[in-house]
Amino acid sequence: MFCIQCEQTIQTPAVKGCSFAQGMCGKTAEVSDLQDVLVYSLQGVSYWATQAHRYGIINDEINQWAPKAFFSTLTNVNFDPERILQLTSQAAQFKAQLKDQVLTASSLANSPLSEVPAVAEFELPENAQAILAFAPQVAVNRGKEGVHEDVIGLRLLCLYGLKGAAAYMEHARVLEQTNNDIYAEYHEIMAWLGTDPEDLGELLDCSMRIGLMNYKVMEMLDHGETATFGHPVPTAVNVKPVKGKCILVSGHDLHDLEKILQQTEGKGINVYTNGEMLPAHGYPELNKYPHLVGNYGSAWQNQQKEFANFPGAIVMTSNCLLNPNVGQYADRLFTRSIVGWPGVAHIEDDDFSAVIESALAQPGFQHDEIEHMITVGFGRNALMNAAPAVIDQVKQGNIKHFFLVGGCDGDKAERSYYTDFTEAAPEDTLILTLACGKFRFNKNTFGDINGIPRLLDVGQCNDAYSAIQLALALAQEFDCGINELPLTLVLSWFEQKAIVILLTLFALGVKGIYTGPTAPAFLTPNLIAIIQEKFDMRSIGNVQDDLNTILAA
């Protein structure tokens, strides 16, 4: 195996990347190698989908399936080799289908194809053993002996960024938001990456193209969520258990949460959100269910202890999944969509009766704990409605600076920086937060500035779109560029969704972003220097020194 896509990958002076029997995330070498073959197969699908598009052939099923399959290879999503093999086999079938259609259309149009790349002609070996034997030829760092390490680094930046965008495309699709222009662009980029490009300038341009495409995807996802569940409104959420039978819903999929809420009505089961599902409480069409009683737990890296202590059924709707056997709760864990773990029950459709049965068989919480309320729901609409009051406080000098502190959480001790940063931020500053990084400080008390809460929970990682809209509105009001605002982004990364959001911000021209806790292992020192120079990206350091630098600017 060779995998270097997440923040926790092995980084030593001698080794970069996971290349042993098991990755740091827990996936086996077998699963990692199978995922490499799946990605290569999907690049072949995208080549033929791109050619088909040129002949006016648009296959909605393949367009919507391909990003979903790519999503399955994102960190902490699918650890099940059988499921990965099924997706790879499906990719081979779709590729053959598109190829036949393209060759027929090409013949009818008397316009033969130019040279077809190897990724498009690849034939999937007949069995798992042969597929695994072939896998080293399509490793994500293939060809490293013949090109500069910067080329490999930028290829991976593009591949991982596109993977993050594919995840958001799937989240949008679940809410019936699709766009053939976006699918066409996705296929073009995916196919091009399958040809192993070597031009650094073209690769850097491609990363910006991915960022801009993802902005459109986040806009589409925002529309899907708000059209389906209403615009989020500031809402108090209890983060302590309530007596009764219970189901815990983790991941990002609001659609699944709604189905679970509908199917548990009147059954005496309380439903809790976990991790990135916390923002669900702000959506009126979800919060209207009285048995959506609160949020349980914290960020993904703590789930093995927290899930073990949860006395009910658990549903993983998307990333991030850890080995459930460690906490011995695999028998009451259920996976959905692209999530998988060997031996764990998987729900193929919207029927959650098995989850309900499991929840009723568990003891549930035996007593109410004293309430602890936090506030969520500062989505795009709420932020825009609050903008006049915020602008007034800025003009009066009561708000001196805005910070967006958020992103992915993780295990490393250096991540305490983000807690320390929010606690050290002066009282005349506002802090926006999003994604699971917020759990390092979202239960703390920050007070308010003349009625405006100092901590504003914007939502999930994809709700960076909402924060961008607020920044654009402020820039318009103050007649300045976005980089001239008293606004600083302090972001933490872990996996590929965070990578594509960073690319989106870069593509929109946002500069001076602080990132951490460490640089991606797939980026060489030279590439990091290029990105720092081009986008004024900063690495987090000492909290007080960073604050002094920011506020003195």
From Swiss-Prot:
Belongs to the HCP family. It comes from the Bacteria. Its cofactor is [2Fe-2S] cluster; hybrid [4Fe-2O-2S] cluster. Catalyzes the reduction of hydroxylamine to form NH(3) and H(2)O. Gene3D superfamilies: 1.20.1270.20, 3.40.50.2030. Keywords: 2Fe-2S, Cytoplasm, Iron, Iron-sulfur, Metal-binding, Oxidoreductase. [2Fe-2S] cluster binds at C3, C6, C18, C25. It is found in: Cytoplasm. Coiled coil: none annotated. The modification Cysteine persulfide is found at C408. It is an enzyme of class 1 (oxidoreductase). Binds 1 [2Fe-2S] cluster. CDD domains: HCP. GO terms for cellular component: cytoplasm. Disulfide bonds: none annotated. PANTHER family: HYDROXYLAMINE REDUCTASE (PTHR30109:SF0). GO terms for molecular function: 2 iron, 2 sulfur cluster binding; hydroxylamine reductase activity; metal ion binding; peroxidase activity. This is Hydroxylamine reductase. Signal peptide: none annotated. HAMAP family: Hydroxylam_reduct.
